Amino acid sequence: MPKTIHRPETRVLIELIRDFRREAGLTQVELSTRIGRVQSFVSNVEQGQRRLDLIQLRDICRAMGVDLPTFVACLEERLD
């Protein structure tokens, strides 16, 4: 089984994060400030070079104004 970072589902996850960030009207810098990280952290996530744990994903979702269950439901919808 390939590493999860190389799976197609990860690409969908990354696209969803980017889409929610843009819908929230946030730049990578603004999002990174909200989560207490540097801009390169968000850039690496969106380029698929950085894995996220569940807590980091939750923090990102909250910073974008979406709760984690809603985000996961949108992810599942895109994956189906």
Please provide the spans of the model-predicted regions.
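A short, Lys/Arg-rich alpha-helix, primarily the initiator
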Residues: 1-23
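Helix-turn-helix/winged-helix DNA-binding modules
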Residues: 12, 23, 49-52, 63
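Short basic helix-loop element that most often maps to the first helix and adjoining turn
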Residues: 15-34, 59
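Conserved hydrophobic/aromatic packing and binding residues within compact polymer-binding modules
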Residues: 17, 31-32, 42-45, 71
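Recognition helix of helix-turn-helix/homeodomain-like DNA-binding domains
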Residues: 36-52
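DNA major-groove recognition helix of helix-turn-helix/homeodomain DNA-binding modules
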Residues: 55-70
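Short amphipathic recognition helices of helix-turn-helix/homeodomain-type DNA-binding modules
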Residues: 70-80
